[in-house]
C-alpha cells in the first residue's frame, strides 16, 4: 500500500513539473497552426486578387505603361504566338522573332490584318549561339521596345533520363532556354532604363518548382530563368522596369501534343489562347505568377508538398508520358 501511495505521489510531482512544458508546447502548436492558416488564407486571397478581380475592371493601358512596341521570341506557335496576339489586341505593335521565316510572315500578316497594328519580323535561330545577337541588336536599335517576352524554348522529345539525351539537345537547352533570355534582356534593357519604363516577361515552367526527374536539364534551365527574372526585378524595379517570372504548368501546345491524358484535362491544361489572355492580365500586377488560375492552385500544392512527394508524382507522370509518346512513334 505504501508503494502505491509513493507511486501516486511521484506521478503527481512529475505531472506538476511537466505542466509548464505542456503549456509551452500547446502555445507552439497554436502558433504554428495559426501561421499556416494565415498563409493559406493569404495565398487564396492572392489567387482571387490576381486572377479574378482584374477581370472585373477595365483593361490596363499597356502602351501608356510600357511603350508601343513588344518583342516576342518563339512567336510562330503555342504560347508565344498567343501572347503576341493578346498584346496586339491591346494595341501594341509586335516584333516577332523565330527561326522559320515562312511561318513568321504568315503570323505577322494575320496579326496585322486582325488587330490593325504594325508588325515586324526577325529571323533568328537561337540554337546557333552568340552570332545571332548582333543582327537582332541592329534590327531593334531604332525601336522603342516597351515589352520583351522571352518565350523561346526547347523541350525534351519526351521525358527521359539525362544520359539518354543527345549532346546536341543539351546544347540546345543551354543556348535556347538559358542564353536566349539572358542575351535578349541585355539587348533591350538599356533602352528601357533610358526611357524609365518597360516590362520583361520571361516564361519559365512549373517544373522549376522542385527538382523534376526525367526532365533534369529542362527543369534546371527553367529554374535559372525564374531566379534570373526575380533578381532582375530587384535590380531594376527602382528604374521603372517591371520584370515578371511567368511559371506555367502544362498548356495545350506542341510540347504536350503526344499526350491524350493531358489534353483531356482542359481546365488544368488550357489552350494557348486562353492561357495568354489570363497571363497578360497579370502583367504589372504580379512579379512571379503562373499566369492562370488552375496553374496557381497547382503551384500552391507544389509549394506545400514535401520534395519526396513531388519527385514520386513526377516520376509516375513522366513515365506515363514517355510510354505514351513512344507508343505514338512506334
UniProtKB/Swiss-Prot annotation:
Binding site for NADP(+): 74-80, 125, 222
Residue numbers of N-acetylalanine PTMs: 2
Keywords assigned by UniProt, alphabetized: Acetylation, Mitochondrion, NADP
Highest rank taxon of the organism: Eukaryota
Places the protein is found: Mitochondrion
Tissues expressing the protein: Highly expressed in testis and ovary. Also detected in thyroid, spinal cord, adrenal gland, heart, placenta, skeletal muscle, small intestine, colon, spleen, prostate and pancreas.
Similarity annotation: Belongs to the short-chain dehydrogenases/reductases (SDR) family. 17-beta-HSD 3 subfamily.
Protein name: Inactive hydroxysteroid dehydrogenase-like protein 1
Gene: HSDL1
